[in-house]
UniProtKB/Swiss-Prot annotation:
Keywords: Disulfide bond, Ion channel impairing toxin, Neurotoxin, Secreted, Signal, Toxin, Voltage-gated sodium channel impairing toxin. Adopts a novel structural fold that may be an intermediate scaffold between disulfide-directed hairpin (DDH) and the inhibitor cystine knot motif (ICK). This is Sodium channel inhibitor ISTX-I. Its main location: secreted. GO terms for molecular function: sodium channel regulator activity; toxin activity.
Length: 88
């Protein structure tokens, strides 16, 4: 009975360890363009960005917002107010 208990516990622990290790991302996985960390320099207002960039809010998956500098697409003399951009 004692050997059976040790074998059962060992099997369960090894199985849990394998699941935990396989769930971790690999070191060489590339960052997706849809991930928040793939954006430009983080900012809190337009003054934090370069001359040709504006501070823009980007919404991810409906409830997560990041604010980063992005190149302006128009001929603005000033950046418009902070604009949310939704990404899925």
């Amino acid at each position: 009975m004692n050997k059976f208990t040790v074998a059962l516990v060992s099997t369960l622990l090894l199985g849990m360890l394998r699941i935990t290790v396989s769930a971790q991302p690999l070191e060489n996985e590339a960052v997706s363009a849809d991930e928040p960390s793939a954006g430009g320099k983080l900012c809190s207002e337009n003054g934090d960005c370069a001359a040709d960039e504006c501070c823009v809010d980007t919404v991810f998956e409906g409830d997560m917002v990041t604010r980063s500098c992005e190149k302006t697409t128009g001929n603005f003399t000033e950046c418009p107010g902070l604009t949310p951009i939704a990404k899925k």
